[in-house]
Amino acid sequence: MSPDKPFRIMGDVGELHILPPKYAYEVRNNEKLSFTMAAFKWFYAHLPGFEGFREGTNESHIMKLVARHQLTHQLTLVTGAVSEECALVLKDVYTDSPEWHDITAKDANMKLMARITSRVFLGKEMCRNPQWLRITSTYAVIAFRAVEELRLWPSWLRPVVQWFMPHCTQSRALVQEARDLINPLLERRREEKAEAERTGEKVTYNDAVEWLDDLAREKGVGYDPACAQLSLSVAALHSTTDFFTQVMFDIAQNPELIEPLREEIIAVLGKQGWSKNSLYNLKLMDSVLKESQRLKPIAIASMRRFTTHNVKLSDGVILPKNKLTLVSAHQHWDPEYYKDPLKFDGYRFFNMRREPGKESKAQLVSATPDHMGFGYGLHACPGRFFASEEIKIALSHILLKYDFKPVEGSSMEPRKYGLNMNANPTAKLSVRRRKEEIAI
């Protein structure tokens, strides 16, 4: 099989057409290759209980607009809140013990990320609500298991059997719980704003609940507020937790990076504090993150699409109608693009930024055919700027406040199944509190 030729495979979702990265540019914005339909086919977003997948691909695009605009543009205003929440939750999940103790890294980081993402998406009150934290932490896991259950059945039976499948039932229950929490919150806010207007005052909330509601009203479109939050959870929380956990594993296995990273944090934050500019200037950290994502993206193929018509590519290759299509990410490990591609080199992209014309390409948030950790093109992850800054804040806190190292005998090898590569969910790290050089 040539890595430069398209091929077909059979997976649990049926027939998949895998394209080499050279087609990424053609695929990226082709209107006959539907991102929305792919989500419906892959995740059954048309069925009850899977609304968290549906809302993120809503044709009104308000989710994408919020992630691309409000979330990105408001980062400067929420950075302090993210840092504050991070400091609080680390006391619970990593503890303040100066003695070495073991943690299951992915579980601990899920609790950390659930709190700090919810702080931005829902505000201070809800981000500490135990019921919401349980919902946001478990919905994607349960829904993905439900998807796997349904894939065992013929497509024509799925709308029927989903009413009897255990994880499908749990998914529907979590959606209802989310609505019972979020809808009253939104209604209360609307009443407060209406009352404030009557008295000539103004009430604003700088979080995703507000951004989504304002944008939906502005565009005159309907949306499901609770499922929009579940969609943010699916898109932001679980993928970010996986990415962040893998970064920690890679640093733990390359401990020579720890002191240079700490020195960079102290130099940058010591002078500039928390700001968009200071996070940009954490260039070694940015390089380490991008290298971690290069070696272990969330999947070995990206740019999931569904062909709504026969699609003829520039060299005559025809993608038949009604097929799921993806683009291979194998250039991540191709020596033609990366020297010693299987070696973890934390300075790889740090050094690349110094090469003429490559400063932009070498940044974590840049999406290219040879690094599709965040996808590529029109549907590249719109929340990658937020994810980048959120991870940098959390990693800065951990590097300054904790020592950490691998636990002997605990494998950090990613879990691979199908097209997926997940950070090992059972791997442990040994951590202990240290005295930070500067207050952050």
UniProtKB/Swiss-Prot annotation:
Class in the EC hierarchy, top level: oxidoreductase
Q: Write down the superkingdom of origin.
A: Eukaryota
Induction and repression of expression = Expression is induced under gibberellin-producing conditions.
Q: Which UniProt keywords apply?
A: Heme, Iron, Metal-binding, Monooxygenase, Oxidoreductase
Entry cofactors: heme
Q: Name one GO molecular function term.
A: heme binding
Q: What is its EC number?
A: 1.-.-.-
Q: Does the keyword Transmembrane apply?
A: no
> Which PANTHER family does the UniProt entry name for this protein?
CYTOCHROME P450, CYTOCHROME P450 MONOOXYGENASE AUSG-RELATED
Function statement: GA14 synthase; part of the gene cluster that mediates the biosynthesis of gibberellins (GAs), diterpenoids that may provide a selective advantage during infection of the preferred host plant, rice. Gibberellins (GAs) are diterpenoids and are synthesized via the mevalonate pathway. Biosynthesis of the major metabolite GA3 (gibberellic acid) from geranylgeranyl diphosphate (GGPP) requires 13 steps.
Tell me its family: Belongs to the cytochrome P450 family.
The name on file for this protein is Cytochrome P450 monooygenase 1
Source organism of this protein record: Gibberella fujikuroi (strain CBS 195.34 / IMI 58289 / NRRL A-6831) (Bakanae and foot rot disease fungus)
Source taxonomy: Eukaryota, Fungi, Dikarya, Ascomycota, Pezizomycotina
Its encoding gene is what? P450-1
